[in-house]
Regions:
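Extracytoplasmic/periplasmic C-terminal soluble domains
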Residues: 146-193
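Elongated extramembrane "stalk/tether" segments
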Residues: 30-140, 144-156
Length: 193
């Protein structure tokens, strides 16, 4: 090989390495952007907890992979109606028995999750699983759970319990809304009219 061929070879190798590095960084940036869009505020929460982008994104990607294995299903109209009626009863109970209502709300949210096809294991895993499909309201779920734990230690006021009910309701409503087939959603009916 003469000097000219060596120079061409070196330039070609450097160009290939630079192109590969650029491709890697572009792919990584796209992955980060997709995860940030999918998980919203949950992305930032996990990043803060993990302290490193690659670890946080690995956690979120594992959650998404785990979630893809679930066979989520919509609720039937009868189940939606039953759950809605039971939620109304839990809310009404709050007036006379706030702690019982919060406990009932937690139990009812778990039942809806189970009926939809989410595995109902320990709280942290439930929150991680639900964060894939409901990244905004999962923080409400965590807040409600934290209030319930504080209440069990005698550290939550009635106002705290009221906030827990509001937080549980946000997830409850989203789980029920997700189970309505698209053709039944109000905005879809209006768009067709």
């Amino acid at each position: 090989m003469d000097q000219h061929q060596i120079t061409i070879f070196v330039v070609a190798v450097v160009a290939i390495v630079l192109a590969a590095a650029l491709g890697f960084f572009v792919a990584r940036k796209r992955r980060s952007q997709r995860l940030r869009e999918r998980f919203g505020p949950e992305y930032d929460r996990v990043l803060q907890k993990e302290g490193e982008v690659s670890r946080a994104e690995g956690v979120l990607a594992m959650r998404a992979t785990r979630r893809e294995k679930f066979e989520l299903r919509p609720l039937t109209a009868a189940l939606r109606s039953d759950f809605s009626d039971r939620w109304s009863a839990v809310q009404a109970e709050f007036v006379d028995n706030p702690k019982g209502a919060v406990s009932g709300a937690d139990q009812l949210v778990n039942e809806v999750m189970k009926a939809r096809g989410y595995p109902v294991v320990d709280f942290d895993q439930r929150a991680a699983d639900i964060s894939v499909d409901h990244p905004v309201v999962v923080e409400n779920y965590r807040a409600a759970h934290e209030i319930a734990l504080r209440h069990s230690r005698g550290q939550a006021s009635t106002e705290d319990l009221r906030r827990a009910m509001v937080h549980y309701r946000s997830l409850f409503q989203e789980l029920l809304q997700d189970s309505i087939p698209v053709r039944e959603l109000p905005h879809r009916r209006e768009a067709r009219a």
